[in-house]
């Protein structure tokens, strides 16, 4: 049995999406048990519509719901101990749950997670890891917005953690890892990127295969299983990719409506277009993982539908089932033992 805590108030639609999404996840994984946190007047009526889910769940009342517009510091002050978001995270800390899922405010969720769960030993800064559809399947990209900037050691930590996530999700024994750079040549890029590359070349790890530098166009190609970058660049890349996907979808729709011949052609090609739409649908690869914490926290898109929230739950389910934290901690311990003298710098939080 896998226990998952849910911030039922998170996201643009709150319980109206969160609860149906959890119900879908339960249909696919009957061994999940949920703990929902939220405002009783909003959560209980929706939960009552799903008898099977209600029977496999526990509801715990909260006093506060964190707004999508709240600043992290405000959310922490107002919501500590009594908000649905904090209580869902705290359930992981106390052992009541093995993973927490929220579609709420990203900055608030990160601040509360760091404050409540703390960081893994020897990890200074968390990263948000996103699942990216590619020509070869799926890749993991991190950091996509937890912090701005990263030094060499932090980038290597991201590489180790991202590889652990790839093993858990993709069941790849030794994921390939690349550092995002302005070119593939070793002489190109910022000093911290070149230093991180040197460290990864000099410190062989059983859990990953370092493939060198990759460029922006390699992300969509699926050149490597894990793409490592710092949060500012990663967040821009993520938003650019999402925007491009929407743009391409709209351009295709316009083209198919332009002439009678195009409309007839669409009828015959509808199956192919449907498969393309499904491949590019953010709801199919929803769920950003907060890596570096001493517990599993998954961030769902705030605008996700029920299928999207279900995807985020399934990411958490796979993380627990494949013992993600234990694997990452073991890999990090090996790296820091092998390379204990890498310097690091501070940084400031990025808003995703």
From Swiss-Prot:
Compartments (UniProt record): Cytoplasm
EC supergroup of this enzyme: transferase
GO molecular function, one term: phosphate:acyl-[acyl carrier protein] acyltransferase activity
EC number of this enzyme: 2.3.1.274
UniProt keyword annotations, A-Z: Cytoplasm, Lipid biosynthesis, Lipid metabolism, Phospholipid biosynthesis, Phospholipid metabolism, Transferase
Similarity comment: family membership: Belongs to the PlsX family.
Oligomer and partners: Homodimer. Probably interacts with PlsY.
Function, as annotated: Catalyzes the reversible formation of acyl-phosphate (acyl-PO(4)) from acyl-[acyl-carrier-protein] (acyl-ACP). This enzyme utilizes acyl-ACP as fatty acyl donor, but not acyl-CoA.
Name by which UniProt lists this protein: Phosphate acyltransferase
Species annotation: Brucella anthropi (strain ATCC 49188 / DSM 6882 / CCUG 24695 / JCM 21032 / LMG 3331 / NBRC 15819 / NCTC 12168 / Alc 37) (Ochrobactrum anthropi)
Species lineage: Bacteria, Pseudomonadati, Pseudomonadota, Alphaproteobacteria, Hyphomicrobiales
């Amino acid at each position: 049995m896998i226990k998952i805590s849910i911030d039922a108030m998170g996201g643009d639609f709150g319980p109206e999406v969160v609860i149906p999404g959890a119900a879908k996840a339960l249909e696919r994984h009957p061994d999940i048990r949920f703990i929902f946190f939220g405002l009783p007047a909003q959560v209980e009526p929706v939960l009552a519509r799903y008898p099977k889910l209600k029977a496999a769940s526990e509801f715990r009342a909260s006093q506060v719901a964190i707004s999508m517009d709240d600043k992290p510091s405000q959310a922490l002050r107002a919501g500590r101990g009594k908000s649905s978001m904090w209580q869902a995270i705290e359930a992981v800390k106390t052992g009541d749950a093995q993973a927490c899922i929220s579609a709420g405010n990203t900055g608030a969720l990160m601040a509360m997670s760091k404050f409540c769960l703390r960081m893994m030993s020897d990890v200074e800064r968390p990263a948000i890891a996103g699942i990216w559809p590619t020509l070869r399947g799926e890749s993991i990209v991190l950091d996509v917005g937890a912090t701005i900037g990263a030094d060499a050691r932090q980038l290597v930590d991201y590489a180790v953690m991202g590889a652990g996530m790839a093993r858990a999700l993709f069941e790849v024994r030794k994921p390939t890892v690349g550092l995002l750079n302005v070119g593939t040549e070793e002489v190109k890029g910022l000093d911290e990127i070149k230093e991180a590359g040197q460290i990864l070349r000099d410190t062989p790890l059983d859990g990953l295969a370092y493939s060198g530098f990759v460029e922006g166009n390699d992300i969509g190609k699926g050149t490597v299983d894990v793409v490592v970058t710092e949060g500012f660049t990663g967040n821009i890349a993520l938003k650019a990719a999402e925007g491009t996907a929407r743009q391409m979808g709209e351009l295709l729709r316009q083209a198919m409506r332009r002439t009678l011949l195009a409309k007839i052609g669409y009828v015959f090609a509808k199956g192919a277009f449907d498969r393309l739409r499904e491949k590019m649908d953010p709801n199919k690869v929803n769920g950003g993982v907060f890596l570096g914490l001493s517990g599993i926290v998954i961030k769902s898109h705030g605008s996700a539908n029920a299928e999207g929230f279900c995807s985020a739950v399934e990411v958490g389910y796979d993380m627990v089932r494949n013992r993600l934290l234990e694997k990452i901690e073991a890999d990090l311990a090996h790296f820091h033992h092998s390379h204990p003298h890498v310097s690091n710098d501070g940084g400031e939080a990025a808003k995703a």
